């Protein structure tokens, strides 16, 4: 392992011991905010520190085995050769593991996520498939013990949604779901198709991270145009008697957000503002990412909604993930929320890209 990497790991080990000592300090325990921040830092350091300690142990084992080679006993030397081989294999495995653990983390990976699903080409069939994707993400959220809340929805005439925005709350939600952004294409025979012909429809998915209040970008109220109107969604007669629905336009960017799923105008406004903040932040993030990644590809789809990332072929029971040339004949399982079969390989490829970029930077 490179000396610079060893030095970095030694620094993290030292910091881990410092944080552990601070967590036992009475003044830190009394300051709940600082205690929480240090607890989080300790948990983030734990895995890499454990890996480095295992690496140090494997190095020590290798040195001990090399010393055994000096023994006169042939059996002992043979045993030493086996131990050297095992220690080298363990060092190689731990080095690869530590390289991944040291990769720069996306600070937003642990935040909640907004998923915006919008029907594209394909009319009613696209809206129905948007509903299918919503159900898929709902099942995936359930499997991860995340909470899901509908922020805004516009139902299709024959089922599904023309557009739906949901908030997914839970640890690591954005970190996993961010790979879902892009164009999702479906190929299947619609129920209304009497000739049995396969139709192709498209749905776009945009995943944005929630912006914590403390980090929220400043939005000038003078830049907002706020309209109220009567909700057209479900919710009983009360909804239609009051102008509880909210439409907020951010004039500088032209971003428009509508929320009408809550009975209270105040709640709809709060939800609309949180989605608006996420959308504006997403635009800023994309500008920064474009500048940083102009020299390398990114598996996290850009704001270009036309970028096709996945195809769902129902007649063949096939899912094709175009970014990594992955084909699975497990369509039913994926539609039932088994997304890790796709997201796992995507994350591995993403890590490989980051490692390659890091190697290029280090020359």
Curated annotation (Swiss-Prot):
Composition bias, Basic and acidic residues: 284-296
InterPro entries found in the cross-reference section: PCRF, Pep_chain_release_fac_I, Pep_chain_release_fac_I_sf, Prokaryotic/Mito_RF, RF-1
One Pfam family linked to the record: RF-1
Gene that encodes it: prfA
Keyword annotations of the record: Cytoplasm, Methylation, Protein biosynthesis
The species this protein was found in: Shewanella sp. (strain MR-4)
Origin superkingdom: Bacteria
GO molecular function list: translation release factor activity, codon specific
Protein name (Swiss-Prot/TrEMBL): Peptide chain release factor 1
């Amino acid at each position: 392992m490179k000396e610079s990497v060893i030095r970095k790991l030694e620094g993290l080990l030292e910091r881990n011991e410092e944080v552990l000592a601070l967590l036992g300090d009475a003044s830190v325990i009394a300051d709940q905010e600082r205690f929480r921040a240090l607890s989080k830092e300790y948990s983030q350091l734990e895995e890499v520190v454990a890996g480095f300690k295992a690496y140090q142990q494997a190095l020590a084992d290798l040195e001990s085995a090399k010393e055994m080679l000096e023994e006169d006993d042939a059996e002992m030397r043979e045993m030493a050769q086996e131990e050297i081989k095992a220690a080298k294999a363990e060092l190689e495995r731990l080095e690869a593991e530590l390289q991944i653990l040291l990769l720069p983390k996306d600070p937003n990976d642990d935040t909640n996520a907004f998923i915006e699903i919008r029907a594209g080409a394909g009319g009613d069939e696209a809206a129905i498939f948007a509903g299918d994707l919503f159900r898929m993400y709902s099942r995936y959220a359930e499997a991860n013990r995340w909470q899901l809340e509908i922020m805004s929805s516009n139902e299709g005439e024959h089922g599904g949604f023309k557009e739906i925005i949901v908030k997914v709350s839970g640890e690591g939600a954005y970190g996993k779901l961010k790979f879902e952004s892009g164009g999702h294409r479906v190929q299947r025979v619609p129920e209304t198709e009497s000739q049995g012909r396969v139709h192709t429809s498209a749905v776009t998915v945009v995943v944005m991270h929630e912006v914590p209040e403390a980090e929220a970008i400043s939005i000038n109220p003078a830049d907002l145009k706020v309209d109220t109107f009567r909700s057209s969604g479900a919710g009983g007669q009360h909804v239609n008697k009051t102008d509880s629905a909210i439409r907020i336009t951010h004039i500088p960017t032209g971003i428009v957000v509508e929320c009408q799923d809550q009975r209270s105008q105040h709640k709809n406004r709060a939800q609309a503002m949180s989605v608006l903040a996420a959308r504006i932040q997403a635009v800023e993030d994309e500008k920064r990412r474009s500048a940083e990644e102009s020299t390398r590809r990114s598996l996290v789809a850009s704001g270009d909604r036309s970028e096709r990332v996945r195809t769902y072929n129902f007649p063949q029971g096939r899912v094709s993930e175009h970014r990594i040339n992955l084909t699975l004949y497990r369509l039913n399982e994926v539609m039932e929320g088994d997304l890790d079969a796709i997201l796992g390989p995507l994350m591995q490829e993403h890590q490989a890209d980051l490692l390659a970029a890091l190697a290029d930077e280090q020359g």
